[in-house]
């Protein structure tokens, strides 16, 4: 029988961290061996905090002990700067990062890619692990060839720190690359309230909504003569991200170098 994948989870007491622990605990080929938190949950059993019962893994408060349990993979949903710090420590230790937190800069990604290449070890960074969200981005890329007029509305819970979301930025980049032309504005716009038309990424307006009761949602709205096309994805709870996260956790061990975006794993 093959050995189980040894998994560590950072941000273990957060919403995504707890969901990841539940998902890992339910897999016959995985086992949780380490967990990292900040304040909430530190010193408690990770399984108890996640709601699946004691797993015998205590949530640590400092990353220094994270690799003592010799994990194969580090699942990390901490914000960008902390995730970068964890990855820089993980890769030299032979631990493969699977990062879902947003906020990493291009310089951060380039540095992590270089580190992974030098150590010949895999890593996955994905703005969104929901398979439906990946398909939404792909469908939007296809639609952009025929509908160059497009705007993006992304909606998230009110605890999300970054705006716009990484998914919205990645969608804008994919749409911009696929468009055969950039349409001019129909009129010269005058914003009587600054920011009313949203922020622009790759020339595409993005509108961010943050409200209690939301989880993660995005609409990509295309317009053409006499018609509109809306491509929408909704994550109604954290479980929507788990199939993609588990796929990345299994596949990262066979990778050499950094993969950015879950779609790269679906294509291979």
Predicted ranges, named:
Residues 96, 122, 149:
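Residue-level detector of anion-binding/catalytic polar loops
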Residues 41, 80-81, 103-104, 128-129, ...:
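Short glycine-rich anion-binding loops that position phosphate/pyrophosphate groups of nucleotides
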Residues 11, 100-102, 127:
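Short beta->alpha connector loops at strand-helix junctions that form conserved
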């Amino acid at each position: 029988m093959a050995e189980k994948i040894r998994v560590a989870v950072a941000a273990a007491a957060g919403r995504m961290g707890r969901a990841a622990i539940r998902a890992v605990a339910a897999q016959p080929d995985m086992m949780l061996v380490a967990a990292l938190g900040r304040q909430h949950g530190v010193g408690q059993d990770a399984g108890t905090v996640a709601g699946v019962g004691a797993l015998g893994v205590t949530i640590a408060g400092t990353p220094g002990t994270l690799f003592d349990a010799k994990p194969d993979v580090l699942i990390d949903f901490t914000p960008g700067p902390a995730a970068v710090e964890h990855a820089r420590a993980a890769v030299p230790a032979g631990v493969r990062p699977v990062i879902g937190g947003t906020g990493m800069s291009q310089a951060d990604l380039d540095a992590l890619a270089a580190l992974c290449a030098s150590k010949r070890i895999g890593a996955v960074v994905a703005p969104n692990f929901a398979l439906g969200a990946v398909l939404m981005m792909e469908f939007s890329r296809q639609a952009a060839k025929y509908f160059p007029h497009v705007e993006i509305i992304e909606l998230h819970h009110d605890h999300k720190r970054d705006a716009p979301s990484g998914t919205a930025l990645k969608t804008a980049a994919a749409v911009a690359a696929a468009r055969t032309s950039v349409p001019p504005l129909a009129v010269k716009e005058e914003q009587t309230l600054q920011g009313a038309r949203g922020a622009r990424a790759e020339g595409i307006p993005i509108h961010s909504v943050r409200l209690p009761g939301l989880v993660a949602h995005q609409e990509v709205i295309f317009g053409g003569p006499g018609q509109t096309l809306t491509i929408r994805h909704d994550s109604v709870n954290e479980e929507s991200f788990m199939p993609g996260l588990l796929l990345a956790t299994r596949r990262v061990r066979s990778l050499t170098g950094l993969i950015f975006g879950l779609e790269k794993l679906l294509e291979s």
